[in-house]
Amino acid sequence: MGSTALGGGAPARLGLAPKDGVFGSNLKQCGGFMLKTTPKVGSSSVRVRASVASSPQKQHSPKTSGVKSGEEVRIAVLGASGYTGAEIVRLLANHPQFRIKVMTADRKAGEQFGSVFPHLITQDLPNLVAVKDADFSNVDAVFCCLPHGTTQEIIKGLPQELKIVDLSADFRLRDINEYAEWYGHSHRAPELQQEAVYGLTEVLRNEIRNARLVANPGCYPTSIQLPLVPLIKAKLIKVSNIIIDAKSGVSGAGRGAKEANLYTEIAEGIHAYGIKGHRHVPEIEQGLSEAAESKVTISFTPNLICMKRGMQSTMFVEMAPGVTANDLYQHLKSTYEGEEFVKLLNGSSVPHTRHVVGSNYCFMNVFEDRIPGRAIIISVIDNLVKGASGQAVQNLNLMMGLPENTGLQYQPLFP
C-alpha cells in the first residue's frame, strides 16, 4: 500500500488517554451487566461463562502493535449475526494472522455461526454467545458491529488494552451535542468520543496506526469523502454548492425485519429516503468542513435501489475560477497514485457498482458538466466492504502494524 495521505489528512480524533475501569482489569461494568475477562488456564480456546463470580486470574498479554509476520492476532466480533459482522467473518477467512476467538449475537446465543450464515459453514468458528457472557481474556482486538446507541456502554466495559474498531455511528461525530441532535439521545461515553480516531484510512492512516479506538466511517461518507476531501483541500472546488445523489443496495439498511425492505416493497423500483436529513449528513459535513477549514453544508439525497449490495455516489460540484474538470481528474490521480484500494478510471469510463462487488475497492471518475464551470464526480464501492467491514479490517491491519491489504486482496465478483 502507498502511504500518501490527502494533504496530511484532517485533524484526528485524538484526545483523552484511556482510563482504568472502576472495576479493575478482571471485571468491567457494561450497562447493567459485567464483562468477564479472566483467562482459561492451560488453554487457548474461548471460554464462555454465564457467571461473573471468580477468584483473581492471571491476565494475558495482548498484542497491541507491531505484530510479527505469522503471529496470531486473536479477534472478537461483537454483533456477528448482522451483515457487517458476517462480512468481517468472510474477510477474515483468508486473513493469515487474524483468528476469531469470540463471536457474540444476543438473539442467536448458543447457535453455531454456520446455522445463521450457511455460506460460512466450512469455517472453524466458536459458537455465538451473548455479549454479557463473552470472555475477552483470550482476545487482542475487537470488531464491534452492533447498532448505534448500544456500543457506548459495551466499549466502556472492555479491557483497556484491547484494540477496537467500532462499525456503528457512536464515535464518528466529534461534537456530542450534534450526536444527540441526530441520533435522539445523549452520548454516554464522551471520554471515548474524544479519544476515538475517525477511520477513513487513506486520509488518516498515520493517526489510525497509533489509535486504540477507531470509529469506522459510514458507507455514504466513505464514497463521498474519498473524492471530495482532496479536491476541497486543494481548493479546486467551491464548497458553497455541493449536491450529492447517492444510491445504495438494500443490505445498507441492515438485516433486521422491516416492512419497507420486503422484496415486494422494493423489487423493480428505487426510492429516496431520509430526504430532510439522513444521519450520515453530519458525518459527511464534518469531514468536508475539516478539509475546507470552514463550515461546509451539502444537499444530500440517498436512494434505496433493488440490489443486494453496492453503492454509487454522484457529486455535482462547482469548480474554482480557472479550474477545469481535467484539473480535478489529475489531482485525484496524483493523490491516489500508489493507493491499492482507490482507483481513478481512465478516460470516459463510468464507474459501475458491479465492478467492485465483494471487494475493498473504490472506483471513481470525473466528468465535465454541460453547464460551464461545473463537474460531475462518480464513485462506487461495495457498501459492506469498503463501506464497512473491509475498511474495518484495513484499519485494524494498520493498528496492528500489518500491511493494509492483508486479507483484503479479493477481486470483485463478476458477473
Swiss-Prot record:
GO biological process annotation, one example? L-arginine biosynthetic process
**Enzyme Commission code:** 1.2.1.38
The record ties this protein, via InterPro entries, to:
AGPR_AS (IPR023013), AGPR_type-1 (IPR000706), NAD(P)-bd_dom_sf (IPR036291), NAGSA_dehydrogenase (IPR050085), Semialdehyde_DH_NAD-bd (IPR000534)
- Superkingdom in the source lineage: Eukaryota
Localisation per UniProt entry:
Plastid, Chloroplast
Q: Which reaction does it catalyse?
A: N-acetyl-L-glutamate 5-semialdehyde + phosphate + NADP(+) = N-acetyl-L-glutamyl 5-phosphate + NADPH + H(+)
Report biased composition (Polar residues) as residue ranges.
56-67
Q: Where is this region: Disordered?
A: 48-68
Mention one GO molecular function. Answer: NADP+ binding
Pathways involved: Amino-acid biosynthesis; L-arginine biosynthesis; N(2)-acetyl-L-ornithine from L-glutamate: step 3/4
Protein name as annotated: Probable N-acetyl-gamma-glutamyl-phosphate reductase, chloroplastic
- Write down the species: Oryza sativa subsp. japonica (Rice)
